Structure formats: C-alpha cells, structure tokens
Amino acid sequence: MSESIMDFRRAKFLISAPDIAHLNQYLPGDVGVEIAFAGRSNAGKSSALNALTEQKSLARTSKTPGRTQLINVFALDDDRRLVDLPGYGFAQVPLALKNKWQQALGEYLQKRACLSGVVVLMDIRHPLKDLDMQMIEWAVASEIPVLALLTKSDKLAQSAKMKTVNEVRSALADFGDWVKVEPFSSLKGTGKPKVLSILNEWCHPQWLMDAMAQESPED
C-alpha cells in the first residue's frame, strides 16, 4: 500500500486532560497513531502547532510561559492524533505543579503504546537544556523516534543558525537515526515542508499500513 499524504490542516480539537490516566478515560483506547509535541514553556510550541496546521488558534498561545498545563489532543482523522504536552521547566511555575507536569510527561512517553513520534521543541538560541535531553532520552529508550525542532530560527542569521543546527546534530549523534534535527520558524515558515514530511512518515507507520491493508477487501 502506498503512503498517502496527511493533511494537517484538518486538525481539530478533541480533548484536554490533566494527566495520562484521564487521557485514557476519554480517548477510544491506546490505538491508532499519536504524535506528541513537547518542549520548554518558552519554546514556541503552540505557535509551531498553529503554523504546521495553518490554524491561527488551534493551540492557544500566551505571552506567559507555562500557561499550557493540560494534555491537549487534536484529531487528524479517526486513527491519527496530535498531542500537545504541558510545557516544562519554567522557573516561575510552582515546584509542585512542575513535578505534576513531569510525572504526566513521563507517564505518557512510557505508557502510550500508540505514540509514533515525539517532537521536542527548543528555542534555537537555547537548545539542549537538561529537561530537553531527558525528554529525548526517555523517548529513545522507549524506541520512539524524535524530531528535535529548533524553533525561532528567524532570530539568528543564516550562518549562526546553521552553526547551531550542526552543533545540536553533533551533540545528538550518538542516538543515531532515532533523532533528527531541523530548524524551524513559525513566523517565516522556515523548515515547514521538511517537518511536515517527517510527521507524515510518522502518521503512516508500517504496522498501521499492514493493518489497513488486511482490512481492505481484495481487488
């Protein structure tokens, strides 16, 4: 079966949940495909989601980092979902709340079998903080591919941007093919075709294609 092209503009809000337990209550089960978006609270995660789906308010943006406290789920179709995980690591968020978020993030990465890929968003000017590395390590340990997305790339000159991209790729080289690194700008659209190509690949894992082929009637 040939791989089709996913139209990410079709994304629509499905549900919000405070943690993975509540997520399991409302979703149709740990089935289909999910792609998670994770990042520090000032990494531009909501803006990236809105840019990739060409919807100005799919994910709510705020000038106050740490505003997104829930797991927000968006449906692409009956089988595929985008999951906006709580922002992590913002200093002004109370410690108890930060710990709650960290627990939810860890539970999701370790328990969600339908997770097909994780986008870890990092401000290109401040990449690979401790929590970013922890997210990447968690995902790879669970054999989940990662896209390390260096956001706000328009903030740097071309030479500085590529220097940072190459440095991050070098720092993550030990993870091999499990981790890809790409620059991205929600404002300028830089990197959008490449990111959508990776997400589309994650939306069509071989096991899902095989299952759909078995369900299709023979010609």
From Swiss-Prot:
Binding positions for Mg(2+) per the UniProt entry: 46, 68
Record-linked PANTHER family: ENGB-TYPE G DOMAIN-CONTAINING PROTEIN, MSS1/TRME-RELATED GTP-BINDING PROTEIN
Family: Belongs to the TRAFAC class TrmE-Era-EngA-EngB-Septin-like GTPase superfamily. EngB GTPase family.
Domain EngB-type G: 31-205
Pfam families, sorted: MMR_HSR1
Keywords recorded for this protein, A-Z: Cell cycle, Cell division, GTP-binding, Magnesium, Metal-binding, Nucleotide-binding, Septation
Any GO BP annotation: division septum assembly
Record: residues binding GTP: 39-46, 66-70, 84-87, 151-154, 184-186
Protein name: Probable GTP-binding protein EngB
TM region positions: none
Job description of the protein: Necessary for normal cell division and for the maintenance of normal septation.
One GO cellular component, as annotated: cytosol
Cofactor(s) required for function per UniProt: Mg(2+)
GO terms of molecular function: GTP binding; metal ion binding
